[in-house]
Amino acid sequence: MSETRLIHLVDDDEAVRHSASFMLRHAGFSVKTYADGVIFLESAQQAALGCILLDVQMPHMDGLEVQQRLNALGISLPVIVLTGHGDVEVAVKAMKAGAVDFVEKPYEKQTLIAALTRAFERLEARSHKDVLTDEAKGRIERLTPR
């Protein structure tokens, strides 16, 4: 991806949204913030391609439920789950629901950047695979019956 990598940051804590988006922008990412999962889901189907940083403990709808709804909508952007409650059970549920990584708050900048780098590599590999699949389908459609 040659364009700026976009991160959808979903966290109910304004201080976390502000500090994380500042740090991520300085690291070269583009960041769109959402105050909770409901607000994010309202725009998720039109959301630009990118990765999702998703807090687990939020009012109205927790991060795991947001993940389930994304899956139900067929939205498969890479999700990195953020939590200040780094218990193993939540991590396992998040990973089973399709999260690509799990980062405990407070996190080190390098840890978060490394998780995002892996998530974007996964997204780019999937995008490349989709392009190759589309090209193969096009070739098959152009074949003449024998």
Region spans (language model):
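Short amphipathic alpha-helix used as the core "switch/output" element in two-component signaling
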Residues: I39-E42, L64-S76, K93
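Active-site beta3 strand of CheY-like receiver
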Residues: A47-L53
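Two-component/phosphorelay signaling modules centered on CheY-like receiver
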Residues: R5, D13-K32
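Receiver (REC) domain active-site loop signature in two-component systems and cognate sites
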Residues: M58
